[in-house]
């Protein structure tokens, strides 16, 4: 600071400093101020950084006047130490005490002005030309220096402070600090108003005004911030003054409609304007402004490189003027690289767009072109681009436009020509454009012919491609090799994805795939699509790196895809957002992350994930060291935070910590990857190897004594194969251990250690050279200080200690960081090599073992055939059949259990299946999954629907399921094969007759009549039966033995759940005292020699089935059981009947039916088959079928068909009576007498059959069921059948006699039903009233029969049949 004048007292100086506390006082001079012409008064001149102050010579000091340096218009130095200052408010003339004081004031003002308005030369004009100017110091630290090269950010802070002082506003120090620190550290030349959006509009205006005098910043940026009028005025002022501002971005800044017109005028004023990038998007602009701007752009000598006018409401007229400007100014053809006219509807729909098309058709330098949402005609545009933009265009966005205005079916030629000729395209966006099928084909054909492009991103989302587009993609996409990223979201593919996904997998150049919003299908189809997708990403040569199924609403079935991510090695990024997979999906994702080592990025949100789901992810990331990025799930986190804030915050912090840890170089756990691959490679084929080795060993032992040389050679080869198979178990760990041992001291580590040593020496040498160079330069610039420092011995010794780099740091950087990354990659490659070698060897061993097994089995068969003795056809045939059966069993077991063809593809398929995590219980328990699983086992869909849809348990026998047909069933009623009484009415013409299923087996061969006869008479029914899977009570809820939940049981209670089965009501005599009382049947007579004990039917042949069939389920009257299936019956076993006794309780379960077994007393060719169906050719068979069809057609009639009137309400049994009947069942059973009748054969054999109770329910229950038939539903009575010899129907009235007669009839009588004319000849008919002891075939009831009263049935049984056919038939 200049020395103050001697006249100024100390007190006055301190008072002036206190008055100017806001700014530091740099100089104080005692001057003579000219107040009037030639009249001078004493004043004090105080100089601060940006202002000159005049004080009176009084204490306390008071400012008389002041002015800012920016107010100075002229500063003249006159003779006699006088200066004349011209300001905006007037002239100021003062006389200083000395020439030195004049020089100090002059330098101060010049320095301040140079900081605010930097420029060359002196800003002070000398009034006396004879007086030479003194020497000017131009050093960087001099006060008169005008150089701003070394100032921070071009002196923005000083300019801003001067402008604040000039406008009388407070200077924001935070603005100065941000610019001097942050902008300077980043070397950022873009001034972003968003960084100071928290300040007032006046502060923003001053900052923008400071840019007018600043040469550092070249870009002014403002987006999504509404600017006031003050700021916009300063923007225009800055553009009119600045010579360094090159780019202006005012995107959605709230510009007025006349701003562009003012901007055009500013461009005309500033001849030195260097602006070359202009962005005015999302601001309304009027046509007048566009016209003015177009006129000014004609004068731009260098044109514009970037012009963004998106969503500016530009009219076609303004576009026409703009296009003409582009064509008139030749600079635009070489300078314009970025053009954005998007979001202006109707802009290119008129003829005014031809001016723009003309510019685009000329050779130009466009790189980025965005015309989305402008209603442009794509084929016309591509025709223009074909001539002018093929060589430079990289980004093309034509979304939300129309393809062509023509309605022809021919593809526009421009599609194929342009996309086959483009050289540098990397992004093509055609989303929300309804592409015709031919246009899509032309597009794909053009890309397939283009050999210049690679890694092209093609966006075809929301194009409504649907099935036709999917078909075109399947046909054409395989030949397209330049597309690296394909977006097919929201195209309505749906079920077409079943064929499209495999087609996408054939394109090996595809790296990124987007398939969201295409899964609007049913659950079963959705699972099939997801399995196809899983199969795609599990292929060994899969090229996909990222997969997106965002916003597909997959819900819980997202886990099907997630389960395949665990062992996946190709995907690095996956997007699962918007699928609503909930916490279960998060848990499945956590399990996948625990073993995955390839995923780097996961995007997931909008999945209804709570804090518990995030906790599962956090725990999984503790063992995952490869995931680098996980998007912040805003929706799910906010929802979880509302319910559990503390837990959500802790869990997310843990997730972020794991991600930060994974972004640093570290050792990856290779042991985990080793164990995973070992399980996938070895476990997939180990069981198959064991089976094949066991089979081959058995064959080797059987053929070891064969003297044939070829056989011995094959035996030797087979032994070698078995040895290789045993050694292959240790192949994988041995190879991995070998690679691990060699890698510890391998050449890579040795080379890294040597490089670390060499780098340490090079670092020391470089530091030595740098130190010597710096010291020499310091000695040159400051020689005196260097001599003093060397004299004190401080310089070189202190610096040498600071420039040393520890060798441990270099070794750690190379070996622990870079070396560890190299080692991790090396371990991955090593593991892949081990996996490949092991898989190849195991595949070869399996293939050779399989061929050896086939060859040895063939030799064994030939030897057994030759060993049969001649002349013994029976024995030889038996031996041959045994040999064939054994060999056939070997071969069939191998083909079925080990795969129909043991080749490399089969092994790969099994390994791929093992890589995928099995479906969880919450998905597999669904009906859709059950149907699909049963379909894979050969069971038609819906087979278990009658049993409640429960899953089968593992305890049940599933052996019979393999014998069921694997093809689908036609939709037929479950009870269509139920026995029907003969009908004479012809069937309806609409339904074909179905053959009786009991006459043929499933393979189409005729059933043998004596099939299973020996087993039938040698096995027990209940206790000793091993193939009967379960009792009836365990079968009823489903095939599962677990009890049903209460809710499900409650739902199964129908309106008629309290009804008992009709078999319980049919045995009561006509004079029963209690309505609904059910008495048990008497036990059958003791067995005779002609009728041995009956065996267990399920063990007979291949026709037995351990499960309930639909026919068996439907054999009861609907409405009397409360639900489908035999749920009302009691358990079998000791509760219903004793093991040694024959008569089981009426609640005994209905056994599975046996096909093809002819019992004594019932000729197989003439009677009923044991599955309850008629068999045998003849007119009666056809008539029965026709009658049944007509009955079914009448039953299925619509609401308008005739129905019988229900019985009166008084005749219906009460619920309490039925409950009492059930409670007294066992008492009535014990009190029933035993009836023994010596009836001749075959009646005795039929009676013997009753010993086993409900072995064949369709033969024991008709007597009871017949009484429940509604008279209105039986048009004619069945034909009477002869009463067996030695048996008379009971005629005595009374309760006891009627009860005994009703109970004895089912237990003893086995009537011969009249089925054909041949049977009629053998058994003459006996005409007469129906016998209560006789039974007829059960009729399929209608649901209205449930109302039939038990009291009503008793007199009806004794009533003779009505010749009109309206009375109820008897019990036959």
Swiss-Prot record:
LRR repeats lie at residues 244-264, 274-295, 303-323, 335-357, 365-385, 392-413, 424-444, 455-475, 482-501, 509-530. One of its GO terms (biological process) is cell migration. GO terms for cellular component: cytoplasm; glutamatergic synapse; lamellipodium; plasma membrane; postsynapse. Keywords: Cell membrane, Cytoplasm, Leucine-rich repeat, Membrane, Repeat. It holds the Pfam family Carm_PH. Residues 1233-1244 have a biased composition (Polar residues). Residues 138-151, 1099-1109 have a biased composition (Low complexity). It is found in: Cytoplasm; Cell membrane. Residues 126-151, 865-900, 970-1003, 1024-1372 are annotated as: Disordered. The C-terminus is necessary for localization to the cell membrane. This is Capping protein, Arp2/3 and myosin-I linker protein 3. It comes from Homo sapiens (Human). The gene is CARMIL3.
């Amino acid at each position: 600071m200049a020395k103050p004048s001697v006249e100024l007292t100390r007190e006055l100086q301190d008072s002036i400093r206190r008055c100017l506390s806001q700014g530091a006082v740099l100089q104080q001079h005692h001057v003579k101020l000219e107040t009037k012409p030639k009249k001078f008064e004493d004043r004090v001149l105080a100089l601060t950084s940006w202002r000159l102050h005049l004080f009176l010579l009084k204490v306390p000091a008071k400012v008389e006047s002041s002015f800012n340096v920016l107010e100075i218009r002229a500063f003249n130095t006159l003779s006699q130490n006088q200066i004349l200052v011209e300001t905006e408010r007037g002239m100021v003339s003062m006389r200083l005490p000395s020439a030195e004081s004049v020089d100090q004031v002059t330098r101060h003002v010049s320095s301040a002005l140079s900081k605010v308005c930097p420029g060359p030369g002196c800003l002070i004009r000398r009034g006396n030309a004879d007086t030479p100017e003194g020497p000017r110091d131009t050093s960087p630290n001099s006060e008169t220096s005008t150089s701003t090269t070394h100032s921070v950010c071009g002196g923005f802070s000083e300019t801003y402070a001067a402008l604040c002082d000039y406008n009388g506003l407070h200077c924001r120090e935070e603005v100065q600090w941000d610019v001097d620190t942050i902008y300077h550290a980043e070397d950022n030349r873009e001034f972003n108003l968003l960084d100071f959006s928290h300040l007032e509009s006046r502060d923003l205006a001053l900052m923008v005004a400071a840019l007018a005098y600043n040469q550092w910043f070249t870009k002014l940026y403002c987006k999504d911030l509404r600017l006031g009028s003050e700021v916009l005025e300063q923007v225009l002022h800055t553009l009119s003054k600045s010579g360094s501002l090159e780019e202006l971005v005012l995107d959605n800044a709230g510009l007025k409609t006349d701003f562009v017109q003012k901007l055009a005028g500013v461009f005309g004023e500033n001849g030195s304007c260097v602006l070359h990038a202009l962005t005015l998007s999302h601001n309304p602009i009027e046509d007048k402004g566009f016209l003015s701007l177009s006129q000014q752009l004609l004068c731009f000598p260098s044109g514009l490189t970037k012009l963004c006018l998106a969503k500016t409401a530009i009219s076609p007229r303004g576009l026409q003027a703009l296009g003409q400007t582009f064509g008139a100014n030749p600079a635009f053809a070489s300078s314009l690289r970025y053009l954005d006219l998007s979001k202006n509807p109707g802009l290119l729909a008129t003829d005014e767009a031809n001016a723009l098309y003309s510019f685009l058709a000329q050779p130009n330098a466009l790189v980025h072109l965005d015309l989305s949402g402008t209603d442009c005609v794509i084929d016309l545009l591509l025709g223009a681009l074909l001539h002018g933009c093929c060589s430079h265009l990289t980004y093309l966005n034509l979304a939300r436009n129309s393809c062509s205005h023509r309605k022809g079916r021919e593809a526009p030629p421009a599609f194929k020509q342009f996309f086959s000729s483009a050289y540098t395209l990397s992004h093509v966006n055609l989303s929300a454009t309804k592409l015709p099928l031919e246009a899509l084909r032309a597009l794909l054909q053009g890309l397939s012919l283009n050999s210049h492009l690679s890694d092209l991103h093609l966006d075809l989302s929301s194009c409504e491609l649907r099935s036709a587009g999917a078909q075109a993609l399947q046909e054409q996409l395989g030949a397209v090799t330049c597309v690296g990223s394909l977006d097919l979201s929201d195209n309505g593919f749906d079920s077409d994805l079943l064929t499209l996904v495999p087609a996408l997998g054939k394109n090996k150049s595809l790296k990124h795939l987007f398939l969201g919003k295409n899964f609007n299908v049913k659950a079963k189809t959705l699972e099939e699509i997801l399995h196809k997708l899983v199969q795609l990403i599990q292929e060994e040569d899969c090229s996909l790196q990222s997969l997106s199924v965002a916003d597909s609403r997959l819900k819980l079935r997202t886990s099907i895809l997630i389960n395949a991510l665990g062992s996946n090695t190709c995907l690095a990024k996956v997007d699962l957002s918007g699928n609503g997979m909930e916490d279960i999906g998060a848990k499945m994702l956590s399990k996948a992350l625990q073993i995955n080592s390839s995923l780097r990025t996961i995007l997931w949100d909008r999945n209804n994930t709570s804090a518990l789901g995030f906790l599962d992810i956090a725990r999984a990331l503790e063992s995952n060291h490869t995931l680098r990025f996980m998007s912040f799930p805003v929706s799910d986190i906010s929802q979880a935070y509302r319910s559990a804030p503390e837990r959500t915050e802790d869990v997310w912090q843990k997730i972020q910590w794991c991600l930060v840890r994974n972004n640093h170089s570290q050792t990856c756990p290779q042991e985990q990857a080793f164990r995973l691959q070992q399980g996938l490679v070895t476990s997939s084929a180990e069981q198959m190897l064991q089976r094949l080795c066991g089979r081959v060993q058995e064959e080797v032992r059987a053929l070891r004594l064969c003297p044939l040389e070829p056989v011995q050679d094959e035996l030797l080869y087979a032994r070698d194969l078995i040895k290789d198979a045993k050694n292959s178990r240790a192949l994988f760990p041995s190879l991995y251990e070998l690679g691990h041992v060699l890698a510890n001291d391998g050449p890579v580590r040795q080379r890294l250690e040597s490089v670390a040593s060499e780098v340490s020496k090079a670092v020391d040498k470089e530091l030595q050279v740098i130190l010597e160079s710096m010291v020499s330069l310091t000695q040159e610039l400051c020689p005196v200080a260097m001599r003093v420092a060397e004299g004190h011995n401080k310089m070189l010794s202190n610096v040498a200690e600071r420039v040393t780099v520890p060798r441990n740091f270099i070794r750690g950087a190379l070996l622990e960081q870079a070396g560890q990354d190299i080692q991790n990659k090396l371990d991955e490659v090593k593991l892949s090599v081990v996996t490949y070698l092991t898989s190849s060897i195991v595949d070869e061993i399996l293939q050779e073992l399989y061929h050896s097994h086939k060859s040895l089995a063939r030799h064994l068969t030939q030897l057994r055939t030759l060993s049969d003795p001649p002349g013994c056809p029976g024995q030889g045939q038996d031996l041959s059949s045994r040999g064939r059966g054994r060999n056939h069993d070997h071969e069939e077991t191998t083909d079925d259990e080990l795969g129909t063809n043991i080749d490399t593809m089969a092994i790969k398929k099994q390994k791929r299946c093992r890589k995928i995590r099995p479906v969880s219980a919450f998905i597999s328990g669904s009906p859709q999954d059950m149907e699909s699983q049963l379909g894979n086992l050969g069971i038609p869909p819906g087979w278990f629907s009658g049993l409640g849809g429960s899953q089968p348990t593992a305890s049940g026998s599933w052996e019979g399921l393999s014998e069921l047909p694997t093809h689908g069933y036609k939709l037929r009623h479950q009870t269509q094969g139920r026995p029907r009484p003969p009908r004479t009415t012809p069937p309806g013409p609409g339904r074909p007759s179905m053959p009786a299923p009991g006459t043929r087996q499933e393979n189409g061969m005729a059933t043998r009549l004596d099939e299973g006869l020996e087993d039938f008479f040698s096995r027990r029914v209940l206790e000793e039966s091993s193939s009967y899977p379960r009792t009836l009570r365990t079968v009823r809820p489903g095939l599962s033995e677990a009890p049903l939940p209460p809710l499900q049981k409650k739902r199964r209670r129908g309106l008629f759940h309290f009804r008992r089965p009709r078999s319980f009501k049919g045995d009561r005599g006509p004079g029963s005292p209690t309505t609904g009382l059910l008495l048990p049947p008497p036990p059958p007579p003791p067995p005779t020699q002609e009728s041995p004990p009956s065996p267990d039917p399920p063990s007979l042949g291949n026709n037995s089935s351990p499960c309930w069939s639909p026919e068996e389920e439907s054999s009861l009257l609907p409405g009397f059981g409360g639900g489908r299936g035999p749920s009302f019956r009691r358990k079998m076993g000791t509760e219903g009947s004793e093991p040694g006794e024959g008569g089981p309780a009426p609640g005994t379960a209905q056994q599975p039916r046996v096909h093809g077994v002819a019992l004594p007393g019932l000729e197989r060719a003439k009677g009923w088959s044991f599955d309850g169906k008629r068999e045998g050719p003849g007119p009666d068979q056809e008539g029965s079928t026709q009658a049944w069809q007509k009955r079914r057609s009448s039953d299925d009639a619509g609401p308008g068909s005739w129905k019988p009137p229900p019985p009166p309400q008084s005749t219906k049994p009460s619920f309490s009576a039925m409950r009492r009947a059930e409670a007294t069942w066992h008492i009535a059973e014990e009190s029933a007498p035993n009836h023994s009748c010596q009836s001749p054969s075959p009646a005795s054999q039929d009676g013997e059959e009753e010993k086993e109770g409900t072995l064949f329910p369709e033969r024991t229950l008709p007597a009871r069921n017949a009484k429940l038939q509604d008279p209105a539903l039986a048009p004619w009575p069945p034909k009477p059948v002869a009463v067996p010899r030695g048996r008379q129907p009971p005629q005595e009235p009374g309760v006891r006699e009627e009860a005994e007669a009703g109970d004895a009839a089912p237990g003893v009588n086995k009537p011969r039903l009249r089925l054909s004319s041949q049977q009629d000849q053998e058994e003459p008919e006996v005409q007469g009233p129906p016998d209560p002891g006789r039974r007829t075939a059960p009729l399929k009831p209608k649901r209205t029969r449930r109302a039939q009263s038990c009291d009503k049935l008793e007199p009806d049984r004794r009533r003779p049949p009505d010749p009109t056919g309206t009375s109820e038939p008897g019990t036959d």
